[in-house]
């Protein structure tokens, strides 16, 4: 297995286990590689749009659907608290973990708190809409804004 694949899997496993982003050092330990090699793997994964990194080039901002930073899109699966990058990704966390969960967020227009149970088959029917200001083809122009 390539170092890039090992790195990606180590990152996602850490997020799944803890709900938090791993440090560069933790990933290096998990893949039994030196920090500089893992840093290079991060750069390649970023170029492939697998990761979004903070300006320091080593802190993980996003490993979709997981967010490396606290925000309004909270997902609880079992007893673990995760942050999603957006409303769309909040549905992806229970799917990625193959576990039911509860999404807590708020309506961007009204500020109304939102909470929804997500089962293994997806969310129940509801009247909510997901609206994104940026067309999907342009999301990666500025994925953090999107």
Features from the language model and the residues they span:
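Short amphipathic alpha-helical interface segments
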Residues: 2-20
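Short acidic, hydrophobic short linear motifs in intrinsically disordered regions
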Residues: 17-30
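Mid-protein regulatory/catalytic core that forms ligand/cofactor-binding pockets
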Residues: 79-146
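Basic amphipathic alpha-helical segments that dock to polyanions
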Residues: 7, 27, 37-54
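Amphipathic alpha-helical interaction segments
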Residues: 18, 49-52, 100
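Short, cationic-aromatic polyanion-contact patches
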Residues: 1-5, 23, 53-77, 120
């Amino acid at each position: 297995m390539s170092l890039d694949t090992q790195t990606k899997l180590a990152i996602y496993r850490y997020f799944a286990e803890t709900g938090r982003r791993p440090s560069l050092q933790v990933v290096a330990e998990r893949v039994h590689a030196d920090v500089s090699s893992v840093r290079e793997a991060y750069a390649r994964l970023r170029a492939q749009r697998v990761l979004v990194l903070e300006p320091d080039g080593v802190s993980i901002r996003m490993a979709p659907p997981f967010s490396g930073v606290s925000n309004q899109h909270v997902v609880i699966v079992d007893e673990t608290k995760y942050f999603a990058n957006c409303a769309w990704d909040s549905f992806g966390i229970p799917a990625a973990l193959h576990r039911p969960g509860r999404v807590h967020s708020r309506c961007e227009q009204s500020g109304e708190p939102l909470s929804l149970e997500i089962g293994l088959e997806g969310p129940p029917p509801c009247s909510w809409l997901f609206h994104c200001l940026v067309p999907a083809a342009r999301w990666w122009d500025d994925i953090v804004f999107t």
